[in-house]
């Protein structure tokens, strides 16, 4: 069922990308990916803002970071609260509302079930000596973003 939804989203994103982002992503077998329409839009907007024009793989990993935080006891348990928590995302709230879901963020949403989740909880631009880089476990780097847990 969920794979059919992903294929449908991919097809619709080519035909009519403007309307696809409002589709809810839900899979009863996988609560990790369940979200409301509002959360889906928020997840895409923050990924577009944080990725600064990077590809869908980078955006999908940013989205996974947010979804992992929602599941973690260290963070709030909703996508909205994770995104709006003070000082967590450099683009929120200042730049967040300047961005909208786009074709790349739609492709990123479609990739979520297929990308290896390394349980990342943090990401940052490649910076040596930052608080995150010295206090958290480095996992991987993609397009100049470092991911940690």
Label each residue range with its predicted role.
Residues 1-22:
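Sec-dependent N-terminal signal peptides of Gram-positive bacterial secreted proteins and lipoproteins
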Residues 23-149:
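Bacterial extracytoplasmic/cell-wall-associated proteins, especially those involved in peptidoglycan
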């Amino acid at each position: 069922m969920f794979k059919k939804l992903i294929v449908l989203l991919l097809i619709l994103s080519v035909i009519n990308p403007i309307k696809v982002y409002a589709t809810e992503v839900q899979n009863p077998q996988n609560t990790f990916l369940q979200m409301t329409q509002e959360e889906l839009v928020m997840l895409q907007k923050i990924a577009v803002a944080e990725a600064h024009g990077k590809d869908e793989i980078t955006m999908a990993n940013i989205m996974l970071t947010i979804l992992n935080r929602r599941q973690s006891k260290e963070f709030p348990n909703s996508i909205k609260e994770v995104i709006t928590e003070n000082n967590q995302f450099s683009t929120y709230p200042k730049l967040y509302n300047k961005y909208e879901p786009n074709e790349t963020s739609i492709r990123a949403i479609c990739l979520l079930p297929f990308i290896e989740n390394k349980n990342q909880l943090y990401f940052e631009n490649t910076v040596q000596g930052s608080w995150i880089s010295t206090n958290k476990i480095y996992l991987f780097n993609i397009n100049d973003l470092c991911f940690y847990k």
